[in-house]
Amino acid sequence: MAQTNGDMEHSKGWSGHFADFSTAQFRRPRSVCSSDETNGSFFLLQRLPKPNQSNSPPMVNRLKDSRKRRAAVVCRIRDTRDGWFSALVLSSLTSSVIGLFQISVKLPHEPYKIQVMVSSQEQVQDVRQSIVELPGTFQYTCFHLEFNGKRINDFVELSEVEGLKADSEIVLVEDPYTEKEARMHMVRIRDLVGAAGDRSDNLHGLNAGLSLHDAVTAEAAADDVKEHSLSKYDITASPSLETILPRVEAPLPKTVKSISLSAWNPPPYHLRQKGHLLYLQVTTNEGEQFQITSHVSGFYVNKCSNHKFDPLPRTTPKKVSAHSLLTLISKLSPSFNSAFEALQESNNKKDLLTTFPFQNAIPNSPWLVTPPSSNPNSHQADITRSQESYLVSGVDNAETLRDWNEEFQTTRELPRETVQDRVFRERLTSKLFADYNEAAARGAVLVARGEVAPLNPTEDRDAQIFVYNNIFYSFGADGVGTFVSEGGDEAARVAVGKDVLGIKAVNQLDINGLFTPGTVVVDYLGKRIVGQSIVPGIFKQREPGEHQIDYGGVEGKDVVATHPDFVSVFEKMSKALRIKKHPVWDKEGKRHELEGSVETKGLLGTDGRKYVLDLYRVTPLDVTWQEEPGSEDYPHRMSVLRLELVEAYWRSKMSQYVKAEVERRRAAKAQEEAANKEQSSEVTESKEQESEEKAEEALDQERVDISGFQLALNPDVCSGQVPQTEEEKKQWAEDEKEVRDACEFLRSKVIPELIQDLHDGDVGFPMDGQSLSQLLHKRGINIRYLGKLAQLSKEKGSRLEALTTLLVQEMIARAFKHIANRYLRNVPAPFVASCVAHLLNCLLGADVNPNPSAEIDASLREIYPEGDFSFEKVTPETLRAEVEKQVTVRYRYTLEAEWFASLRHLQVLRDIAIKLGLQLGARDYAFTKAQLPAKVPVANGVNGASHDEGKKKKKKGGDSKSPSRAVVEEKPVISIVPDDIVNVVPLVKDASPRSSLAEEALEAGRISLMQNQKQLGQELILESLSLHEQIYGILHPEVAKLYHQLSMLYYQTDEKEAAVELARKAVIVTERTLGVDSADTILAYLNLSLFEHASGNTKAALVYIKHAMDLWKIIYGSNHPDSITTMNNAAVMLQHLKQYSDSRKWFEASLAVCESLFGKQSINTATILFQLAQALALDQDSKGAVGKMRDAYNIFLNQLGPNDRNTKEAETWLEQLTQNAVSIAKHAKDIQARRLRRINMNPRVTTLGTKVQPQVGQTAPEASGAKGAANASMDSRSIDELLKFIEGGDATSSRSKQKKRAAASNPKLRGSKKSSA
């Protein structure tokens, strides 16, 4: 996206996207409001004109004068299909500034007139869309609007409609239908009345986009009187898989039995001439079947039956017709209206975000789903499922065929001068990439399944190419020998993955005049498939002597092409990516100057555009890795540095340059001042001179000119280039040294720093393979360094035992993925489940069955004589050996002898399922003999599949009817059967760029907050939120991140209600886009719990903590380092509820984890001992309180010394507790009685005692919004207050004092550089 800052004036937008089947055109940013409070209202964000302040950044300038006039409002936004929801969005408060006014819309049917709030800058089609979405006007889809008797063009702005002003009346006029409009109308009505049923496709898996938020919230709201949710919670209990499964819900009210196309379609020619479009069949709840004609004038009941064709209007007994199918059905079915209202009410109970349709992102498909056997009736007959392709796309599917490449490039060529231009351009770009990614992934699945005919069927399978839906597909394998010297198929597979990352980086740069093809990489069933938009001219046969490529290496490195038109655009790209301009030599030794790597190619398309291709080498090779012992065994030579590492190296070098420049200036200034001092006799002004020096030095530092700093890396060093002259060799050696320095920077600085940060507890700890990979990539560390990280982690001892476990687990899971992909690549589709199940049994189920055998249908196998069934020969021993070999070769790490005995089976299974795209049926999997049920009849090899005795009985009863029952019972026990592999979903890697405009606003907001301009910073972040929602849509991972950040901002500014609302949205969007059990989802739930507690809703907060802890058990297990903070928060919340006994249990659990990780003499442990001592005092255990406080005091004394604030405070507490211990014991009974009467716990203890949970890789100060983490005191309560409370006294104090002491919270629990293991 464009990096330039533009004016922010007159930009407009709407807070979210709404699906519109009937509008094929992409709409410009909308800004529409409805004033009808009963029907909800739409609020817009209207950007205000920029004040003329030249010294401030443009984004800051724009909001300087407007910030007092902006407010966050809670408004109701609705979607036509899913009801209403409350969302925090922005509203400009002055309609005079934003051009808002109200108009009336006259309707042909009830309610005959509605009021709509509009903006003069929005388009007429946006008004259309708001009409379509209002409950009273659901039925209208085919209409136009008129004003003063004249038709208004849908694509003009309201300001262009002559005479239109406030309180004007426009008229809705129903249009005649076309066949397409009639089809769209039917699809929409089926959605509205809940008759659409489940749509199944090959891209979205089962329960795609699942959210559990509503179910968890329902548990929190179930009974306010009952005991808290943690009362019987067992921290050490085994994880329950039901935590991540959708809850059983009551079926939605049924409005009609079915709406489908009739068997009489399509209309004969002579009836088409009379306006017949479609024939429909509707069966009402009363059991009556009606044949309906879709006519250009509307819909009417005809005289057809299932056996007789007569599409003329029926006269008796029901002569009914209507322009809308919805109205017609309501006339035909007496029960329809009441059922439809009940359906809407049922939908309204859900948070709309949980059912809102995805638009700019692919929903997450959970790895664990409800097994089909648990609900045999889940798949219902619905003839329209097979008709939907026709309804949406027409007879020949031509309506959905798009010229993807032309769309991408024309979108890039859209104007970007004004902010309004940029908003529209980035919205369109985001939507286009989302549509393309989805279409390309669907096609790739068909290619992988062999359902698309190749263009070159005579070639080898890996060399075949395909075109489907105007997308060009090829395999990520070395079918034509391009990568023979680099590692063959392995190198090709890595190259296409790196290519997507390179294209994504170039897309983000948004260089004017440089174009990239739409690119997606899909991993499915062991195959890697590349889908690209078709570049004009890429298949063109060139004249003899002409190269197929215009810039860069042609067919390898032997022939090099150059073209003057590519120099300028490649120069811009290379400068931004830190690529050095350098020479390369062809096979004849001829020198060519290239701006990028010889592997990066430029193609001049027949459309005149300059395309860049093959961006897998935008960074240099990791030379040090390739020269290490064991490099000859590494699968390929495509091990390059990450872009994040190059950027970090550049920043490090620039920092050194700036420091050297400042030192040089200081030295020069010192010499100058020394000379001046000798000449001057005025000593009295030395102090003033000193202060001037400091000020000038600061200015010098600010004014360091970095234009003299140059750092760029040559991506072609150590890759076979042969310099010819001595000068070239010298320059090449210098380039190679710079690359080696970057590699050394990774090894000697970046990797050790990460290990140290995790050791010291300075950053959020990864929870699973996904969060670990994200953390490494963010730091610029390649996955191949997992082995080195594991070695360094091991050296740190028990403190990083959790990290070592995660690293080893990730290496094993990735090794298994490579092995499984190799077997899956050529396995026939019906045997994929057997293959995966057998490999998993060999890895995870060897304790249950040391000799598992693959379940294969012999008769089915016979029809695949060329299929690869080598997976049958795999045994637990051979698989372990292969895993060990893969880990050694790929990560240069040696697994321990009995590594498989210490595997955390559930966590490994989850990691593998996510990496292979598996969806497993949920049941209690048995991976050890101890987990096997005592004596359970085994059905189809399933062991322990049922959750309760009732289900077992049902299954037993059902199985008894099977003729093969006796044979099935004789099967040996295995952990996983083929039926457990319910589905496999494709894994998609895309090149979608992020919105630079939204990020600019966010960055400006962050800078303002860092400069203590809180109000301005908040305004800018709110601005960024609106831009995020406009550009990405509501359901997108980037939007979830921003909801999280914004909720944290509101929490810190004490706007608790807004913080809770945004945190709730963050939870739902994170669940639906990243997964119901992702690490980000856990953090979202933990922060929501914190905000709910701060709002006084502590019972609900504990429900969210319980859910997060349950998720933690599934994805990591127990005793995660970050769980210390969570358990402490839970304990403090329980104190707030006066559940002192339960509170001390959670402090004790937190202490146990802390001692195991940080040791018994660490500051972390002392901090928790301090809190535990207070909890024991509150629970009337004065003796225990004294003991724990003494332990805390001793640790602080040894670690921090006698003069430290923590040591002194612990000493004071210890003295007071000791003095009062005897009297407390004497009056125990009296204390208890008075405690029940007079306790009034200080709210400060709870609100200020809880801590924000940092995200993975995020520092604790970043999470809490603090600038630094100083040694804060351990508790904001005074000793007198606590002792008064223990003795039954009144411990209340003013809230103003509580807030003043907000900074005095507990020291960080997650680690300290001074603590010792």
UniProtKB/Swiss-Prot annotation:
One of its GO terms (biological process) is mitochondrion organization. GO terms for cellular component: cytoplasm. Residues 382-626 form the Clu domain. GO terms for molecular function: mRNA binding. Pfam families: CLU, CLU_N, eIF3_p135, TPR_10, TPR_12. Residues 669-700, 939-966, 1252-1273, 1288-1317 are annotated as: Disordered. The keyword Secreted does not apply. TPR repeats lie at residues 1040-1073, 1082-1115, 1124-1157. Keywords: Cytoplasm, Repeat, TPR repeat. The keyword Cytoplasm applies. InterPro entries: CLU-central, CLU_dom, CLU_N, CLU_prot, GSKIP_dom_sf, TPR-like_helical_dom_sf, TPR_rpt. It is found in: Cytoplasm. Belongs to the CLU family. This is Clustered mitochondria protein homolog. It comes from Neosartorya fischeri (strain ATCC 1020 / DSM 3700 / CBS 544.65 / FGSC A1164 / JCM 1740 / NRRL 181 / WB 181) (Aspergillus fischerianus).
